[in-house]
A protein has these predicted regions:
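Conserved beta-propeller blade signature
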Residues: 64-65, 117-119
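Conserved small/polar residues in nucleotide/adenosyl-binding loops
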Residues: 139-145
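Beta-strand-rich domains and repeat architectures in extracellular enzymes and scaffolds
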Residues: 8-32, 36, 40-78
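Residue-level detector of Asp-centered blade-edge/turn motifs that repeat once per structural unit
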Residues: 59-61, 112-115
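A short beta-strand motif characteristic of beta-propeller blades
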Residues: 41-47, 91-100, 135-138
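Short loop/turn segments that connect beta-strands within beta-propeller blades
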Residues: 86-89, 130-133
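A short loop-to-beta-strand structural motif that recurs across blades of beta-propeller domains
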Residues: 80-83, 125-127
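Blade-loop segments of beta-propeller domains
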Residues: 52-54, 80-81, 91-114
Length: 146
């Protein structure tokens, strides 16, 4: 039987219930607990920012990060970005400067690393970003592939 990622802390990731895309490398898309929505009223909150909003992760309680890139494959040089957002209003609490992604446009990925930083892969760059959305370091990936 396949083990459930939600029942243990994922090695290498920040101690969070959703530190990486799909909840873990095996993409089980499940977490402990429930929505407790039976007696609640559904509320839908959305934003429109003309960006390719790819995914959100949780780092710590109520610390939600949204990552993405620009949707254009032609025109201005593309860039990636990471935002720390408020869970209820979706207000931007912090945002990285434009993060280079090279000529290879790919939606990318984000993960909360066990050291507390957010790792963002975008195009052919990998960035380490603080919880305040400050770029700490980056690596240029030599192969322009996803």
């Amino acid at each position: 039987m396949t083990a459930q990622d939600r029942s243990s802390i994922l090695e290498g990731y920040y101690k969070s219930h959703w530190p990486v895309e799909c909840g873990g490398n095996r993409r089980q898309k499940a977490t402990e607990g429930s929505l407790n929505a039976r007696e609640k009223k559904a509320v839908v909150q959305s934003i429109r920012n003309e960006r390719w909003n790819v995914m959100t992760i949780y780092r710590d309680n109520n610390e939600i990060f949204l990552g993405g890139t620009m949707p254009s494959f032609t025109g201005p040089e593309p860039f990636g970005w990471l935002q720390k957002i408020e869970p209820e209003s979706l207000e931007i609490l912090a945002e990285t400067p434009k993060l280079p992604c090279g000529d290879h446009v790919w939606c990318g990925a984000i993960a909360a690393h066990q050291n507390g930083n957010i790792i963002k892969v975008n195009g052919n760059y990998m960035h380490s970003i603080s919880k305040e959305c400050e770029a700490v370091s980056y690596t240029h990936l030599t192969l322009p592939t996803s």
